[in-house]
């Protein structure tokens, strides 16, 4: 990432949708994607919305029920001076995978800080549906998010490949990963 991480406040406010409640299909898919990667440890990060908090809490329970380890849970605000403290903590534990959820505005600010200031890798990250939209990915820039993968609300998979967000076709839950996108 070559531009400073902080986005203009008006752009972030327009993207500050609190997000819908996570669906069971979405939670199942996020869990499946993480287990498929054969990860033992995760660090979970989320915005402070009720939906993001509930989604990541449910994921953490499922993860630990599988005998896996949650190294840390980091929350971030929608607006902050720089997100440096949260980004540093999120990346510090060096987990096998990172899991992210939250409203797009705060997530974009946090993600831009991660890219600018830490060794965080999008390709080792799985995200919930609210982050797999053109709007959310566009705030960070798809070219900055190679191999970021996540679940759709209907239990499908979305991924960022070659600078583009790839989602299942409408009406088909499908897997964005017929070509290895998970």
Feature map (PLM): residue ranges:
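Intrinsically disordered/low-complexity terminal segments and short unstructured peptides
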Residues: 1, 40-42, 181
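Flexible loop/hinge segments that line or gate small-molecule binding clefts
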Residues: 1-17
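Short hydrophobic/aromatic-rich motifs at helix boundaries and adjacent loops
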Residues: 3-4, 28-32, 83
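An alpha-beta-alpha
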Residues: 13-75
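Extracellular/periplasmic bilobed ligand-binding domains
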Residues: 52-156
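Extracellular/periplasmic ligand-binding modules, especially the Venus flytrap/periplasmic-binding
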Residues: 107-109, 145-182
